[in-house]
Amino acid sequence: MAVVTMRELLDAGVHFGHQTRRWNPKMKRFIFTDRNGIYIIDLQQTLTYIDEAYEFVKETVAHGGNILYVGTKKQAQEAVANEAERVGMPYVNHRWLGGMLTNFQTVAKRLHRLKELQAMDAAEDGYKGRTKKEVLMLTRERNKLERVLGGIADMTKTPSALWIVDTNKEHIAVSEAQKLNIPVVAILDTNCDPDVVDYPIPGNDDAIRSANLLTSIISSAVEAGRQARAERQEAAAKEAAGDADKAPAEAERTEAPAEEAPAEAQSEAKAEGNTEA
């Protein structure tokens, strides 16, 4: 079954690129034609690249990896948050903090601080003994951290891969991922550089419907990866149980000749006695 159909891509406007005067020549191979000063992306290629990205994400998750969703532009914020939350993956949809990957230890300290503030707010007596001004300052600090780091609050290590909507907008995230050899899966509009992406999906990164559709496909791959992982674990458990059941039977077969040994010895003794007679 196809991951997505050509009709779905067309309906979402995935084929619309940027104006012909705003383009990256490296994207030429992904362009089908231009119409009224707008580049039209070759959706046949898009379908092929979607399949490749889907399989990569699926296998990454199947092996226990996680995907960090990144999209801070207005058109991508809702899709990134909704789809990441749907499949329980971390996300950044407001502002990318420099060093979020390359200096994750420092970010982890801020995450710890965020959890402290959240626990304080959740406790009945969390603000006991503090003035109204102090409570206000702590609340502002918590809100700021939640806005910037809320999507990665449960992330304990750097991600296995990134899903990015608009690599130009998220160029810092792309650069950090490259430094750490973290694979990047991303929508490539006609003004993007395909050389910085490991698993490109040629498409419209400005339209909300396009961002929604392509991000939902990545989430479907995450779900498929989780299912594959569960199936593999179940198969491994059954195999281990089967090996455990075989062990006693093999032990019994190994002990059987020892039990038969006395009878064989008696037969040999009788034979020797008859010979002497």
UniProtKB/Swiss-Prot annotation:
**Gene Ontology annotations for the cellular component aspect, listed alphabetically:** cytosolic small ribosomal subunit
Write out the entry's keywords from A to Z: Ribonucleoprotein, Ribosomal protein
Query: GO: which molecular function terms?
Result: structural constituent of ribosome
Q: Does the keyword Ribonucleoprotein apply?
A: yes
Q: Pfam families annotated for this entry?
A: Ribosomal_S2
Please list the residue ranges that the record marks as compositionally biased, kind Basic and acidic residues. Answer: 227-256, 267-277
Whether Ribosomal protein counts among this entry's keywords is yes
Its GO biological process annotations read:
translation
Span list, region Disordered: 227-277
Note the superkingdom of the native organism. Bacteria
Q: Which PANTHER family match?
A: 30S RIBOSOMAL PROTEIN S2 PROKARYOTIC AND ORGANELLAR (PTHR12534), SMALL RIBOSOMAL SUBUNIT PROTEIN US2M (PTHR12534:SF0)
Q: What is this protein called?
A: Small ribosomal subunit protein uS2
Organism in which the protein naturally occurs: Corynebacterium jeikeium (strain K411)
Organism lineage: Bacteria, Bacillati, Actinomycetota, Actinomycetes, Mycobacteriales
